[in-house]
UniProtKB/Swiss-Prot annotation:
Species for this entry: Naja kaouthia (Monocled cobra)
InterPro entries membership: Cytotoxin_Cobra, Snake_3FTx, Snake_toxin-like_sf, Snake_toxin_con_site, Toxin_cobra-type
Changes after translation: May be regulated by glycosylation.
Tissue spec. comment: Expressed by the venom gland.
Subunit composition and interactions: Monomer, or heterodimer with alpha-cobratoxin (AC P01391); disulfide-linked.
CDD domains on file: TFP_snake_toxin
Disulfide bonds: 3-21, 14-38, 42-53, 54-59
GO MF, one example: toxin activity
Record-given protein name: Cytotoxin 3
Physiological role: Heterodimer: has no cytolytic activity, but retains most of the alpha-cobratoxin capacity to compete with alpha-bungarotoxin for binding to Torpedo and alpha-7/CHRNA7 nicotinic acetylcholine receptors (nAChRs) as well as to Lymnea stagnalis acetylcholine-binding protein. Monomer: shows cytolytic activity. Exhibits concentration-dependent growth inhibitory effects in the lung cell lines A549 (IC(50)=1.22 ug/ml) and NL20 (IC(50)=2.76 ug/ml), in the prostate cell lines PC-3 (IC(50)=4.46 ug/ml) and RWPE-1 (IC(50)=0.65 ug/ml), and in the breast cell lines MCF-7 (IC(50)=12.23 ug/ml) and 184B5 (IC(50)=2.83 ug/ml), with high selectivity for the lung cancer cell line A549 (selectivity index=2.26). Induces primarily necrosis in the A549 cell line, and mainly late apoptosis in the MCF-7 and PC-3 cell lines.
Length: 60
């Protein structure tokens, strides 16, 4: 699986066990992701942070 880094022009290949790509947004500003990468399980959203997870190459 390949996931985009913070700047979508760059990406990385996920290590074994990390089978999801994610992007994280601040709830107050959903237009600009603050973090992207590989993850093993999608975190729960909170009052401040929203996560979007997916499982295809460079989907984040």
């Amino acid at each position: 699986l390949k996931c985009n880094k913070l700047i979508p022009l760059a990406y990385k290949t996920c290590p074994a066990g990390k089978n999801l790509c994610y992007k994280m947004f601040m709830v107050s500003n959903k237009t600009v992701p603050v973090k992207r990468g590989c993850i093993d399980a999608c975190p729960k959203n909170s009052l401040l942070v929203k996560y979007v997870c997916c499982n295809t190459d460079r989907c984040n």
